[in-house]
Amino acid sequence: MFVASERKMRAHQVLTFLLLFVITSVASENASTSRGCGLDLLPQYVSLCDLDAIWGIVVEAVAGAGALITLLLMLILLVRLPFIKEKEKKSPVGLHFLFLLGTLGLFGLTFAFIIQEDETICSVRRFLWGVLFALCFSCLLSQAWRVRRLVRHGTGPAGWQLVGLALCLMLVQVIIAVEWLVLTVLRDTRPACAYEPMDFVMALIYDMVLLVVTLGLALFTLCGKFKRWKLNGAFLLITAFLSVLIWVAWMTMYLFGNVKLQQGDAWNDPTLAITLAASGWVFVIFHAIPEIHCTLLPALQENTPNYFDTSQPRMRETAFEEDVQLPRAYMENKAFSMDEHNAALRTAGFPNGSLGKRPSGSLGKRPSAPFRSNVYQPTEMAVVLNGGTIPTAPPSHTGRHLW
């Protein structure tokens, strides 16, 4: 009995020790895990769910919503593509897809600045930042060239020319980014994350040139005789102007703000992540949505008659939908022509059409009915102004007092 009770006590002690060990390990894991994240989440992705660093969750939500809207716009444009018949609206569809692809890349790159950096993440950041912005700015520059042609001449460049120009302009930034990575990482064998903020900004000078040229060319899209395309130019100008403001703000904060606020590198990643999300939404709201809306609008009916244009003959629709020209409502009245008036005077007995000279020895004859009929013949307008009745001369009128 004594041995059995001793064994039970030992078993209870072992179970109590195991329970305390489990509770202690769980408490230590909870203490090391950020609030809002799971236990099995890698430390690299803690910023995506850490409630103590709320900026990551906010920027993540904004970027995710922007990515969904961009995908929806691409799907709408793809579905409605067979119904776009107008040549000037169908030619830039490829450019629109390219621009939406670059905007989607900006929203996706935002997550690379939220998670913790390593060698791979830093290389992706340094390469894709300049390339994606170069793609978007190149598409905006090609669009500015197209709208300027449409406003001035009424016809734009072909679709392959727009896409080719955008890709060629983007290729320059690809070469710059590759050279920067090769010279600093491969040749000098430095870590990919070991770079100064000034070096990062200097590698983006070409993007700044594209943005400034786009802003300058967008100003000329507001001048031209084809006014139906000026609204596209206005939205393009707004997009370029807001992009300039965003770039000035983030470069000021990235280069000087963190130093002045004595934050070190703590705010570098939030600054760049917010810049990507804000730029993506500017591109979507002020360029992608207006352009796609304009592209999907039905074409104008060029053969529709303008009933308010008096310089054109009026048209009416017959039962067979044939256009028949009608006479003008303001036809010239020829009843008062001088030839008919002189003929009427000769008929009344006045030689050579002279009203004031009578032949000697004769009082002449009273003007006959043809004379009175030739004096005045009302026009259609006179009938309308007279209330629909034809004005006639009184019975005692002799026809002598014509004016």
Swiss-Prot record:
Residues 1-28 form the signal peptide. Residues 29-56, 116-126, 184-199, 256-271 are extracellular. Glycans are attached at N30. Residues 349-371 are annotated as: Disordered. Keywords: Cell membrane, Cytoplasmic vesicle, Disease variant, G-protein coupled receptor, Glycoprotein, Membrane, Phosphoprotein, Receptor, Signal, Transducer, Transmembrane, Transmembrane helix. It is a multi-pass membrane protein. Induction: By all-trans retinoic acid (ATRA). Its main location: membrane. GO terms for biological process: cell volume homeostasis; positive regulation of canonical NF-kappaB signal transduction; positive regulation of canonical Wnt signaling pathway; positive regulation of inflammatory response; positive regulation of macrophage cytokine production; positive regulation of neuron differentiation; positive regulation of protein tyrosine kinase activity. The keyword Transmembrane helix applies. It is found in: Cell membrane; Cytoplasmic vesicle membrane. GO terms for cellular component: cell surface; cytoplasmic vesicle membrane; cytosol; extracellular exosome; extracellular space; intracellular membrane-bounded organelle; membrane raft; nucleolus. The chain crosses the membrane at residues 57-77, 95-115, 127-147, 163-183, 200-220, 235-255, 272-292. The modification Phosphoserine is found at S354. GO terms for molecular function: G protein-coupled receptor activity; G protein-coupled receptor binding; protein kinase activator activity; protein kinase binding; protein tyrosine kinase binding. Expression is high in kidney, pancreas, and testis, medium in brain, heart, prostate, small intestine, and spleen, low in liver, placenta, skeletal muscle, colon, ovary, and thymus, and not detectable in lung and peripheral leukocyte. According to PubMed:10945465, highly expressed in most brain areas examined, with the highest levels observed in corpus callosum, caudate nucleus, putamen, substantia nigra, thalamus, hippocampus, and spinal cord as well as in dorsal root ganglia (DRG). Residues 78-94, 148-162, 221-234, 293-403 are cytoplasmic. Belongs to the G-protein coupled receptor 3 family. It is linked to Megalencephalic leukoencephalopathy with subcortical cysts 3: An autosomal dominant disorder characterized by increased head circumference apparent in infancy, followed by progressive motor and cognitive decline in early childhood. Affected individuals either do not achieve walking or lose independent ambulation in the first or second decades. Cognitive impairment is variable and accompanied by poor speech and dysarthria. Most patients have early-onset seizures, which may be mild or refractory. G-protein coupled receptor involved in the regulation of cell volume. This is G-protein coupled receptor family C group 5 member B.
